[in-house]
Amino acid sequence: MHSCWNMKLQNEKTLGHSVSRSSNISKAGSPTSVSAPSRFPRTSVTPSSQDICRICHCEGDDESPLITPCHCTGSLHFVHQACLQQWIKSSDTRCCELCKFEFIMETKLKPLRKWEKLQMTASERRKIMCSVTFHVIAITCVVWSLYVLIDRTAEEIRMGQNNGILEWPFWTKLVVVAIGFTGGLLFMYVQCKVYVQLWKRLKAYNRVIYVQNCPETCKKKIFEKSVIIEPNLESKEALGIHHSDTNSSYYTEPEDCGAAILQV
């Protein structure tokens, strides 16, 4: 009987454990019973308020700090020195494209041996090479033609001096020489303007540019810093006064006690 009673108790215990285990599993499996642990607080995702460069959208550091070169505000207020230098070199402009403020900068040319090639596409390089080749050939032909015409004209002048008469072919050649010379000068002037612009671009690309901060933005920064520092100083003074009051009260209490003891 005793053994049967023990067997019955063991069966009841096993049934109770299985029931409780199944209930725990069902609770764990149900989505409504899951609750977030209290030790892991929920964090809200907020946009970063860090200052970033308006060209590369990166933050500033000790090696490449952010500067404020113009009057733009908001997300366009800051820019890296290197990013702005590269933009000025490629665009060949000296003012902001938005607020039109002319940058305050110091320029210095690199040594000639350290000059870099102008960044151009393959089609632009091909056009420049073809243009230079055509211009060299055209200038050679014009110079040779003028030389031949001038030489023959000089011979006719000598013959005319001997005969005392200058024929029509001489005047025709003289007009052709004058027109050719004038056209050659105009052609050289137009092409020289193109090459001068190209030379300016190359010089601008090989300049070392240091852009300074806008004076007004610097004043604003100094004013903001002073406004932030002044309340801190006032709070420190208030804390110092409060601390001195507590210390004085702390030291005056024993004096009162001593006086009371003397009276006794």
Curated annotation (Swiss-Prot):
It catalyses: S-ubiquitinyl-[E2 ubiquitin-conjugating enzyme]-L-cysteine + [acceptor protein]-L-lysine = [E2 ubiquitin-conjugating enzyme]-L-cysteine + N(6)-ubiquitinyl-[acceptor protein]-L-lysine. The keyword Transferase applies. It comes from the Eukaryota. PROSITE patterns: ZF_RING_CH. Residues 15-47 are annotated as: Disordered. Zn(2+) 1 binds at residues 53, 56, 80, 83. It is a multi-pass membrane protein. Zn(2+) 2 binds at residues 70, 72, 96, 99. GO terms for biological process: antigen processing and presentation of peptide antigen via MHC class II; immune response; protein polyubiquitination. A zinc finger (RING-CH-type) spans 45-106. This is E3 ubiquitin-protein ligase MARCHF8. It comes from Xenopus laevis (African clawed frog).
